[in-house]
Amino acid sequence: MIDIRAARNDPERFRAALARRGAATAFDELMAADALWRELLPQVDDLRAQQKLQGKPTPEQLEELRARKERLAAVEAELAAAEAARDAALAKVPNVPHDSAADGMTEDDAVEIKRWGEAGPGDGREASEIGQIDMERGAKVSGSRFGFILDGTALVSFALYHYALDRLVNEGFTAVLPPVLVREEAMYGTGFFPSDKADYYEVTADKLYLVGTSEVPLIAMHMDEILDMLPLHYCAFSSCFRRESGAAGRDTRGLFRVHQFQKVEMVVYTTPDASWDEHERMLAIEESLLQGLDLPYRVVNTAAGDLSSAAAKRYDIEAWFPAQDRYREVTSCSNTTDYQARRSGIRYRAGGKSLDTPHTLNGTAATDRWTLAILENFGGAIPEALQRFGAPARV
């Protein structure tokens, strides 16, 4: 969540920044709710101070004391309601976008930063026509937007995840196999709830949710903790689940947009003064992984209005898909500044014993979409970098 104390001290700056992502109204509602709470707080303090009487009270004083208690109970109830309203409003305000985040409200407003590699024509076939991908049986077993990845194509995917994890471990990341069912607090702390709750699967009997990214458990694992050492670098492999409730009619063929997919994720905890350098380093790792597979791509700076609730800035890397004749997103890399850590109650010891809020970042190191890009760009030939991890030379 945003720092409400900082917002009180400089509301105009916060409002102007949040307006870039269409959240000025949400900020106004927060400030109004906070103003009411702050107005009621001293009233409660004053009424509590008036509850004591000196010496033996007269009947008139007892009657006055009874009236004060009734008034105190009423104002305390108002204060509790105001605090709940303020906290609910605070939960809905997204992170403040960084000044360098691109202007605009949609994915079409993203600003291209660079391109790498030659965007070739391919052989005209989509990935589902090249690899062993069975969407029909996936639909029979699980419904639409599910599929089986089989045989050599499955080996390519396994090799891809091994390739990414091997690189990240060599870069100093700690490998993690996280849980994929989490409590609501974990989804709230990472900023996915309440704004995107409809996008995630709920196991209602156990009050658990299937994660859409291992970013969630990698942040929640330090929830309500004080960290003694920064930075922390984690990488995780997990299955991910998304309802894709807003994707009706989009990418209905193949595995590009599905309800279940695999992903290798990076998560970093660091100090505020180091987080922007860390953001660039994570982007460089993503680029290096794609370059190692000789996949053409472009990097874009996401528009402020298209950022996730938690992100202050995000880079997307879009790989070239020749059968679609366009670049499509295969990674994202976000700096969430102190937003997730503040929501999750995570702090660290800064300069001795003082406590501060760390910055957290996340980025994609590999997903099933990379396998699709490999199939389309090379017509079934598999990069040597993956053959070293068990992939066949061709599928």
Task: Describe each model-derived feature in a short phrase.
Residues 114-395:
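TRNA-recognition modules of translation machinery and tRNA-sensing kinases, especially anticodon-binding
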Residues 1-119, 132:
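N-terminal alpha-helical targeting/anchoring segments
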